Amino acid sequence: MKTYYEQDANVGLLQGKTVAVIGYGSQGHAQAQNLRDSGVEVVVGVRPGKSFEVAKADGFEVMSVSEAVRTAQVVQMLLPDEQQAHVYKAEVEENLREGQMLLFSHGFNIHFGQINPPSYVDVAMVAPKSPGHLVRRVFQEGNGVPALVAVHQDATGTALHVALAYAKGVGCTRAGVIETTFQEETETDLFGEQAVLCGGVTALVKAGFETLTEGGYRPEIAYFECLHELKLIVDLMYEGGLTNMRHSISDTAEFGDYVTGSRIVTDETKKEMKRVLTEIQQGEFAKKWILENQAGRPTYNAMKKAEQNHQLEKVGEELREMMSWIHAPKELVKK
């Protein structure tokens, strides 16, 4: 595994160049501000709206996506996956010039062929492995978050060096930047989200909650045991792996972990995980998601509404009113 650090990157390669950050959401605001603090010239390309005003208030020169691409030598695409292909076709593609770099923080659109850059531009990825607010906060504290770097197309012969310069400007070489490929980053990211981090965990939490409530236990108690305490366990794993978590819990809980875990996540579960991975690798999920967006998201919207109306959510909303240390915004925001 090749990992790059501060001494392996030269942010000076971006001096005299302009970086266009396309999009000013979670990653956009963090990467743009970190780059600026590293002495890099940054412009923000967004359409008129809330993000336009926020970027302007943050002191950036804000312009249309087309103008930003024409202005910059490095173009970082930080729009949501489902918007990138359309914006690329409408405003980016015709404005690309020989020798420019097209950057991404997720490989979805390149790997699944939704964006096909011309052969005369570099195509690379710098993917911080943390949400935007953490990328920014840790940078301001003098540190950085780990990231992945990949080169899809090296038209100039310097693509990796420029990508590492960008990673250093964002602060990621302070922690370490691991070399990967667009394929590996995309497929593992989608699998992790679907099978473990989002799909797997939410299904497990709901199943546990429903098992307890159907067994006659009060929903409030079920919520505490199946969702609320999950953060305590995840934090222990996050800080020191499974061993640290097991060292920190009671022996009763640890024994229950050993004898029961494999009854919940069975060999059949793992077989299904492999089927999910195959669907991702073969592009079936990507096709499904692209078609879902083209159709106006009927399935997505219906499932989202049903999930939001689950008893677990209603009970949780009430119980969190008891928790003074939780400062959740009334309006949901992407971090």
Curated annotation (Swiss-Prot):
One Gene Ontology molecular-function label: ketol-acid reductoisomerase activity
Which residues belong to any copy of the KARI N-terminal Rossmann domain?
1-180
**UniProt binding sites for substrate:** S250
Keywords from UniProt, A to Z, are: Amino-acid biosynthesis, Branched-chain amino acid biosynthesis, Magnesium, Metal-binding, NADP, Oxidoreductase
- Asked if the record carries the keyword Ion transport, the reply is no
**Active site residues of this protein:** H106
- The KARI C-terminal knotted domain extends over 181-326
Q: Which GO terms describe its biological process?
A: isoleucine biosynthetic process; L-valine biosynthetic process
Cofactor(s) named in the record: Mg(2+)
Q: Which reaction is recorded as catalysed by this protein?
A: (2R)-2,3-dihydroxy-3-methylbutanoate + NADP(+) = (2S)-2-acetolactate + NADPH + H(+); (2R,3R)-2,3-dihydroxy-3-methylpentanoate + NADP(+) = (S)-2-ethyl-2-hydroxy-3-oxobutanoate + NADPH + H(+)
Q: Where does NADP(+) bind?
A: Y24, G25, S26, Q27, R47, S51, D81, E82, Q83, Q84, G132
The positions annotated for binding Mg(2+) 1 are D189, E193
- Enzyme Commission number(s): 1.1.1.86
Pathways per UniProt? Amino-acid biosynthesis; L-isoleucine biosynthesis; L-isoleucine from 2-oxobutanoate: step 2/4; Amino-acid biosynthesis; L-valine biosynthesis; L-valine from pyruvate: step 2/4
| Gene Ontology cellular component annotations, sorted alphabetically | cytosol
Does Protein biosynthesis count among this protein's keywords? no
Function statement: Involved in the biosynthesis of branched-chain amino acids (BCAA). Catalyzes an alkyl-migration followed by a ketol-acid reduction of (S)-2-acetolactate (S2AL) to yield (R)-2,3-dihydroxy-isovalerate. In the isomerase reaction, S2AL is rearranged via a Mg-dependent methyl migration to produce 3-hydroxy-3-methyl-2-ketobutyrate (HMKB). In the reductase reaction, this 2-ketoacid undergoes a metal-dependent reduction by NADPH to yield (R)-2,3-dihydroxy-isovalerate.
Q: Which family does it belong to?
A: Belongs to the ketol-acid reductoisomerase family.
Supply the name of the protein.
Ketol-acid reductoisomerase (NADP(+)) 2
